[in-house]
A protein has these predicted regions:
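Nucleotidyltransferase catalytic core that binds NTPs
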Residues: 1-486
Length: 486
């Protein structure tokens, strides 16, 4: 049963007094505090087989090997630490106490605030552990960003979250949602951010890490989570390090032919930019929490997974974020990469960006937001809209209040905003809402408005409210065609 009021020292003491839990701690870099909590709690001999701190890089390399790229605070280093330390525990202690102990290896690799306070403070923390003596091993791995302004406070927070991770893995493992929630016990998001979590192992086969990542954002533990095109969870700053990001935001329920036209033409223009290296470009489809919420303002988790599956099938990375305003999104992306970023937008979204009411809470208003949105390495690519009279609405005839027109013209002239060219006018009548309505009614022809493989997935899984009888009739038609071809 989850007890939010259970303190860090009490958690460490309970683990120490549990005679089944036994293993080792390995902490390199700035994360030296987790094992200390267990010693200070008392009874540490019941839990701690070994603690190790490899602070010097040469010592660390001698023990765990050299990482590709020479970086130390990366997931691959953490996994080497966990596997090596756990294997040593099993090798040296299995004969003596393997039938009565649940072995574990705890590890972290962390860079904390430097003396000048100029660096990014973050770290990888993980636990490899058994839930039964002699049983299989599981992993829970998290990535954190530290927000305290003092090195000592960062170390304290790392120790707390390390204890929380261990306690959660051993006592809340039956409810991964509770385990996730408990990671922030005795902490606040002002002190630490968890931007990635991954559960793996035989005891977590039913855990969908994409849902766990969604809950990180829902719970406010982070502002964004990222999935690869294979559907696996990624740590954003590691996955997007030294990458050009090309991003499209939308509800994408479902993704339609007009989205594909926007992406293909927008990507072509982005790759033509002189300061863009094609080999470093990643395409991301972004879903905001706001766009995931249904009419009752509750997120339908199955619908979320369906959208992610479809986007991944197209080879896209997928980001779920709580950055409703574009300038906040760009502030976040600029923290992940120093290379050029492109945003793919429809002209209605550009119209919304120029609405001053969105920035009334900022002291500098729209100018303050634009200073972030249109930073040195950002460019917006705008997909035109088909108007009721059949004309095309683009940057060339963009309507903006008179007092903002010089600002708009400045951005166009200085290559911050550009129309997407060579668009397919035949697709421009397609809207997500109209396609969704056709799907829900089972109206013939909806499948011609979305990519072929997307239509196939929707039919196979009856997504987005597609009536079952519609799928049945389609299947019967295919059978008749097949028989007729015999």
């Amino acid at each position: 049963m989850y007890d939010k009021n259970l303190g860090t020292k009490q958690k460490a003491l309970k683990i120490n007094l549990d005679r089944r839990i036994y293993g080792s701690f390995a902490e390199i870099g700035a994360g030296q505090e987790t094992a200390a909590y267990f010693f200070k709690a008392g009874g540490a001999s019941g839990t701690v087989a070994k603690t190790m701190s490899a602070y010097d890089m040469t010592f660390s390399d001698a023990i765990y090997g050299i990482e590709e790229g020479g970086r130390y605070v990366v997931e691959s280093r953490l996994m080497k630490m966990l596997n090596r330390e756990y294997n040593l525990v099993e090798k040296r202690l299995s004969e003596k106490r393997g039938t009565e102990s649940q072995f574990f290896a705890f590890a972290n690799t962390v860079v904390a605030l430097n003396f000048q306070k100029t660096n990014e403070s973050h770290g990888w923390i993980g636990l490899q552990f058994q839930l039964t003596p002699g049983g299989p091993t599981n992993y829970v791995v998290i990535h954190v960003r530290m927000r305290d302004n003092e090195n000592l406070l960062q170390q304290q927070a790392l120790g707390i979250i390390g204890v929380n991770l261990m306690y959660g893995c051993f006592y809340y493992y039956k409810s991964p949602e509770t385990l996730l929630l408990s990671l922030m016990d005795d902490l606040t998001t002002e002190r630490i951010e968890i931007d990635m979590v991954r559960f793996s192992g035989p005891d977590f086969v039913k855990v969908d890490n994409r849902l766990m990542s969604l809950r990180l954002v829902k719970n406010g533990f982070t502002d964004a989570a990222l999935f690869g095109s294979d559907g696996g969870v990624l740590q954003p700053s590691e996955a997007l390090y030294k990458k050009h990001i090309l991003m499209m935001r939308g509800r994408l329920r479902p993704i339609t032919n007009v989205h594909i036209d926007l992406i293909s033409n927008g990507q072509r223009q982005f790759l033509a930019e002189p300061d863009v290296d094609e080999s470093k470009v990643v395409l991301i489809s972004e879903l905001t929490l706001h766009n995931l919420k249904a009419g009752d303002r509750v997120i339908d988790e199955k619908d979320f997974l369906d959208r992610v599956d479809i986007l991944c099938s197209l080879g896209h990375m997928v980001m779920i974020s709580n950055h409703h305003e574009y300038f906040r999104l760009m502030a976040y992306l600029s923290r992940l990469t120093k290379l050029k970023v492109g945003l793919l937008l429809g002209s209605p979204s550009l119209q919304d960006i120029f609405e001053e009411k969105h920035y009334e809470f900022l002291p500098g208003g729209i100018l303050e937001s634009f200073a972030t949105l249109f930073s040195r390495k950002v460019k917006l690519f705008i997909y035109p809209t088909l108007q009721a009279d059949g004309s095309v609405y683009s940057c060339e005839n963009f309507v903006v209040p008179d007092h903002l027109r010089p600002l708009f013209q400045y951005l166009v002239v200085n290559d911050k905003i550009e129309d997407i060219r060579n668009f397919n006018k035949e697709h421009m009548h397609i809207t997500t809402d109209s396609v969704l309505d056709k799907i829900k009614r089972g109206e013939p022809g909806w499948d011609k408005l979305v990519p072929e493989n997307v239509a196939q997935i929707i039919k196979e899984k009856l997504l987005f409210g597609l009536p079952a009888e519609n799928n049945y009739l389609d299947t019967v038609k295919q059978i008749h065609q097949a028989v007729g071809n015999l």
